[in-house]
Amino acid sequence: PKVAAEKVEDLPTNEEKQLRPKEVKFDTWDDLLKWEPGKRVDDDLNRASVPLASRFQGKQINEQANPDAKIQALSNMNSKAKDHASVGGEEFKAYAFDYWQYLDSMVFWEGLVPSADVIDAAHRNGVPIYGTLFYNWSSSIKDQERFAETLKEDSEGSKTFPIARKLVDLAKYYGFDGYFINQETTGNLVEPLGPKLRDFLLYTKEYAKSVNYPIKYSWYDAMTYEYGRYHENALGEYNYNFMQPENGENPVDTFFANF
């Protein structure tokens, strides 16, 4: 007789009694602005402990391959850390990425702050890892206001941004290398904000250098500089401003054309 296979549940039991650390999440920008290093009870366990290893390029096997080509992966490395422990657990299912040698950078697709196990795995293999600044594919007023709130200045026209500083402070404290910007929100509130976003990006770089922790931005091709959302699928007239250097500094460092 046929016997049904036992279903293995991939859920923690007695979750309310778990003392293992959770990944670092922020529900609002206000929550982010209130964050301070070391104030969370599990902060030490959520910090990376492995510095970014140096890498070297081996002998080129295929003469037709372009040595300047770069590969960046966007991956759900720890998709259940919000409910499970950010340091792993006894669950049956796990995503153990093992192709680090092919990557130039990894994006932690789940949120702003990669969990420590993922940062350490990337760094052991010499791969920079980025958190994700995610803005919905949307034109709702709520989502437009959320994007605009990111760009709130210390005072009007100051070109200094409190959220930019917090992003750098987060990366420095938890030990990751920058952010992937997935900005797909569009609408009347968003369309004029391209120049202000460029100022935000440049200020981030300036502040990061001032605290001796330079970070990088990777840019997903969705928001144009002046006209809202449009996938140009290349670096061109609608988006080049986000890559255009100023005083030797690029607003963003890598360009992710499309999937």
Which residues fall in each region the model found?
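Chitinase-like catalytic core of GlcNAc-active glycosidases
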Residues: 64-256
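Boundary/entry segment of secreted carbohydrate-active catalytic domains
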Residues: 6-94, 220-225
